[in-house]
């Protein structure tokens, strides 16, 4: 019992160290992208905190799996200390952890982040007082609070199972509803709300992560255009525009006024000339920068990283395809959320994670790598696509020049994507997320030649969805993810959409040429001349 307690403490200590690493990563990540001129303390802290909570929630996944696996021996029997009370206590500890973290996520998504966002939107108007800003922000935030309340009510009051008897009265149905409400409906309400956010995260992952998984490695492999060649092209463009301006101005040398068309063309040419000269300054700065020379020396390493990332992307895509194909061929159908009893088509990650889970914390390391990979590929997708509302581009994400409102949007999207990674990992390795490395005993008839008869032998078998409930403990993560079958069905179809968008993004990324070393300078009219270092990085 003492050894078991010591091992459990070690597991939670590693989780604590991971919390510190997450906070450090979020601080560096947010500071890297926030604008140096428009930096706001509240928006920065909000972005760091919300992203950290999402990552901490994902970090709880391997702890959950480790705890349910650690209660059983490899031969399928429970350990001596793992009685019913201890098992329930461990499950409740993880469950309360999820309750706390998911409640904080709901608070961030439906109150704090919208409030801070609308507060800074009102702050742009210099005529308004702080009191007016707070009142206006609270007024707009109230709409998000109402949405959150509706989601909680729907999750709590809508029963999953109504009476099967068609002759049952309405009173019996209402009675069953309130009986269900008193039995764990807090879990159902929270699960419904989080699943709704995860569904939005799935859409964000389809839009940004799927494209970023192809764009990031190919951009690393292709690299950027030559700075010297870009300067030469830019110089030629400057000379051409200056000559065009001189031609237009020569028309008014004799005192005649320019026509409206010539004045409009002259104005456009002058704006174009200012942009080209601004590009020239930045190109000159980058060409002479020591950072550019250092990055040039690291070019082979970037190619290696690009090849590694594309191989990892192909591994994920193949695993996700095989997992979805298994559900399409062998699942219990859409009414069950495409649950699969057993594993009929194995995929690489589904085989690897249960093996690593037996040697703690190797699965921790792999899960961390997967989550960070999703973060970086999502960030690559957001940087390439931008933040859009239908056909309207709201914000651009630029290193060192992201506005506070855009930073909040960015962390909101990443928070939702990280929420969805738990289901993505389940899709890649359903057995691992559901039961870890648990085994249970089944009786097998064996024919013995020595005794001229049959004998019964208990043999261990890996836990799956068809296993007895009293023999295999389901992770709390799985309980949250699959409380409502229709969300699981939506995730299943979303995985197919994810694969399609990845293939489209792969084709688009292959067809696109190399990026400019000052990508986005033409679009940023608010770029000041004292910020060239943002591009040099």
Swiss-Prot record:
Glycosylation sites: 75, 85, 166-167, 344, 445, 454
GO biological process, any: insulin receptor internalization
Transmembrane segments: 8-28, 48-68, 98-118, 142-162, 186-206, 303-323, 362-382, 406-426, 484-504
One Pfam family linked to the record: LMBR1
UniProt similarity note: Belongs to the LIMR family. LMBRD1 subfamily.
Intervals of motif YERL motif: 229-232
Source organism per UniProt: Rattus norvegicus
UniProtKB keywords: Cell membrane, Cobalamin, Cobalt, Cytoplasmic vesicle, Developmental protein, Endocytosis, Endoplasmic reticulum, Gastrulation, Glycoprotein, Lysosome, Membrane, Phosphoprotein, Transmembrane, Transmembrane helix, Transport
PTM entry text: N-glycosylated.
Function summary: Lysosomal membrane chaperone required to export cobalamin (vitamin B12) from the lysosome to the cytosol, allowing its conversion to cofactors. Targets ABCD4 transporter from the endoplasmic reticulum to the lysosome. Then forms a complex with lysosomal ABCD4 and cytoplasmic MMACHC to transport cobalamin across the lysosomal membrane. Acts as an adapter protein which plays an important role in mediating and regulating the internalization of the insulin receptor (INSR). Involved in clathrin-mediated endocytosis of INSR via its interaction with adapter protein complex 2.
Protein name: Lysosomal cobalamin transport escort protein LMBD1
């Amino acid at each position: 019992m003492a050894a078991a307690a010591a091992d459990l403490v070690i597991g939670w200590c590693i989780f604590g160290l991971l919390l510190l690493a997450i906070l450090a990563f979020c601080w560096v990540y947010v500071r890297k992208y926030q604008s140096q001129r428009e930096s706001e303390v509240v928006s920065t802290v909000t972005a760091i905190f919300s992203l950290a909570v999402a990552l901490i929630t994902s970090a709880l996944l391997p702890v959950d799996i480790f705890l349910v696996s650690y209660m059983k021996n490899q031969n399928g029997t429970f350990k001596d200390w793992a009685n019913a009370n201890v098992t329930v206590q461990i499950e409740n500890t993880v469950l309360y952890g999820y309750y706390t973290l998911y409640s904080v996520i709901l608070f961030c998504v439906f109150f704090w982040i919208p409030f801070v966002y609308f507060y800074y939107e009102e702050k742009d108007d210099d005529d308004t007082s702080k009191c007016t800003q707070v009142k206006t922000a609270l007024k707009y935030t109230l709409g998000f609070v109402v949405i959150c309340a509706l989601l909680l009510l729907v999750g709590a009051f809508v029963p999953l199972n109504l009476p099967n008897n068609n002759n049952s009265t309405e009173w019996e149905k209402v009675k069953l509803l309130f009986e269900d409400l008193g039995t764990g409906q807090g879990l159902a309400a929270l699960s419904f709300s989080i699943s709704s956010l995860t569904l939005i995260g799935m859409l964000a992952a389809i839009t940004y992560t799927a494209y970023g998984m192809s764009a990031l490695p190919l951009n690393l492999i292709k690299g950027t255009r030559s700075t010297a060649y870009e300067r030469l092209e830019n110089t030629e463009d400057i000379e051409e525009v200056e000559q065009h301006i001189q031609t237009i101005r020569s028309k008014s040398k004799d005192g005649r006024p320019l026509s409206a068309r010539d004045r409009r063309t002259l104005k456009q040419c002058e704006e174009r000339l200012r942009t080209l000269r601004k590009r020239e300054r930045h190109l000159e700065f980058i060409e002479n920068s020591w950072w550019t020379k250092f990055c040039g020396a690291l070019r082979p390493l970037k190619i290696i990283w690009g090849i590694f990332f594309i191989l990892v992307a192909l591994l994920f895509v193949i695993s996700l395809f095989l997992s979805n194909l298994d559900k399409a061929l062998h699942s219990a159908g859409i009414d069950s959320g495409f649950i699969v009893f057993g594993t009929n088509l194995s995929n690489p990650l589904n085989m690897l994670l249960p093996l690593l889970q037996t040697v703690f914390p190797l699965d921790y390391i792999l899960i961390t790598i997967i989550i960070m990979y999703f973060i970086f590929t999502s960030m690559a997708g957001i940087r390439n696509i931008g933040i859009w509302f239908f056909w309207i581009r709201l914000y651009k994400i630029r290193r060192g020049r992201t506005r506070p409102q855009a930073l909040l949007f960015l962390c909101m999207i990443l928070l939702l994507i990280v929420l969805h990674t738990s289901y993505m990992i389940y899709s890649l390795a359903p057995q691992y997320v559901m039961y870890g490395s648990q085994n249970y005993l089944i009786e097998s008839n064996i024919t013995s030649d020595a005794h001229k008869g049959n004998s019964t032998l208990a043999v261990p078998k890996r836990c799956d969805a068809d296993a007895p409930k009293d023999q295999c403990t389901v992770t709390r993560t799985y309980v949250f993810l699959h409380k409502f079958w229709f969300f699981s069905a939506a995730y299943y179809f979303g995985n197919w959409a994810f694969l399609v968008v990845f293939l489209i993004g792969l084709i688009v990324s292959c067809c696109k040429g190399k990026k400019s070393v000052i990508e986005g300078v033409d679009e940023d009219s608010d770029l000041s001349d004292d910020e060239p270092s943002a591009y040099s990085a």
